[in-house]
Amino acid sequence: MSLADSLYELIVQTSTNLPSDIRRLIADAQTRETPDTNSSLALATIALNVDMACETERPICQDTGMPTFLVKTPVGYDQLVLEEEIHQAVARATKAGKLRPNSVDSLTGKNSGDNLGPGTPVIHFHQHRKNEVEIRLVLKGGGCENKNIQYSLPQELPGLGRADRNLDGVRKCLMHAVYQAQGQGCSAGYLGVCIGGDRTSGYEHAKLQLFRKADDTNPVADLAELEKYVVENANQLGIGTMGFGGRVTLLGCKVGVLNRLPASFFVSVAYECWAFRRLGVVLDPATGDIVRWQYREPDEIKKLAVGAGFRLTGREVVLEAPITDEKIRSVRAGDVVVINGIVNTGRDAVHHHLMHHDSPVDLAGSVLYHCGPVMTRNPDGSWKCGAAGPTTSSREEPYQADIIGKFGIRAVIGKGGMGAKTLRGLQEHGAVYLNAIGGAAQFYSDCVTQVDGVHWLEEFGVPEAMWQLRVNGFATICTMDSHGNSLHRDVDASSLKELGRFAEPVFGH
């Protein structure tokens, strides 16, 4: 296997096949969650999706994130050649549909189409005195990246009071970091943490903690105790998988420390989603062949699913556009809702555009899906959907109620929920918010029977274009209805109350 092929295989496997340690955590989470709840249903769907992605070698989640490589080479190894080979492997994987084109010009909004551009991919080069090349890769999507957070101590925190410049102040920050993420970062999640450093090095070091194995033990006793405390107690907040409420909210916490300036005390948190895509390879420096894999164990759990994901009972609400006002007002928060027929995707660019322009398709009575799919072209010019899970909906909060009212949309599908403005819009105009399972890109792409068309592809790129998808059996949970009910509001309130139980010092003053 050449260097080019080895790098390509690393990218493909990272995107499509979870590492052994993360598989164990998801398997354990399924046993700990209360059966027959929304969170247990979400975990079952996650497990099934992981199996589907591995079997078909397609992306676990449609948001394949910002590829971040951690590279160690022998002294004297040509890193410039390796950098170019990594770039070519990233472009190759993007063309093959293993990565979604995610590199966007921040000024023009133009998607590069191949995941290459200033700052992408991210590559950290280091030298070591071993005669081998070590390359680790993490794919961290935008939903969880947006839930990263940085604290500057001392700082007042909701529910917890003042976080001081000590280990107990750090503890409060980490508990708050889990609370503020709710389900928007695709919980159950993981924390990579840095205590200290400056604003830049702190975030970088926090992300580097995600390369630690899930079952390792921090060599610093105080930090090992802190990591254990946070995992145990964050799971008492009741946020649950996808923010549906439940026992399993956090799967891991890894804390590092850097020296700081006297005037600064930063606590930087990198929030990682359940779809923790992180693998590594050790290469022969002469041939580029893979000598061994990292984060892969011979006895890993090969099959995670123990059920069928959404277990349909016949009591589900079935919706197909165009949906009437009477039909949509019969849907209540907590209902399992199955979508058949046409759905139109729309993310950030589409929402902003629709505020000022007409839609290219009739949206009256329609279903709008917050989704940026992975798409590849068939030989006949038609499109094939390779991954189609939901994106985080909170980014559309400034627009959503206006878009619903302007076009008569009846159902919005996304993940993580939306806020008070959207909830009022659902009541006023007669619409619902449906929470799909975040990261379950193969579970949902399997529901796509046909791609009927695409609009604004040239202007916005693949993730941000408006895709017209024909679906069958697309299962969701109604979490916000047209009667003012919101599961997300309720879980936020209850978890904030629980957070207050952890205000008292634990690690001293």
Question: Across the structure, where does each feature detected by a protein language model lie?
Answer:
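C-terminal binding/interaction regions
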Residues: 245-253, 260-262, 446-509
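Glycine-rich beta-strand-to-loop/alpha-helix junction loops that act as flexible
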Residues: 191-198, 340-341, 415, 438
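Short, structured beta-strand/loop micro-motifs enriched in basic residues and often containing a Trp
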Residues: 313-323
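Non-transmembrane, aqueous-exposed alpha-helical and coiled segments at domain scale
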Residues: 1-193, 198-310, 403-405
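Short, charged beta-turn/beta-strand-edge "cap" motif at the junction between a beta-strand
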Residues: 336, 342-346
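Feature captures the catalytic cores and cofactor-binding loops of soluble hydro-lyases/lyases
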Residues: 212-245, 345-474
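Short, well-ordered loop/turn sites that connect or cap secondary structure elements
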Residues: 330-331, 337
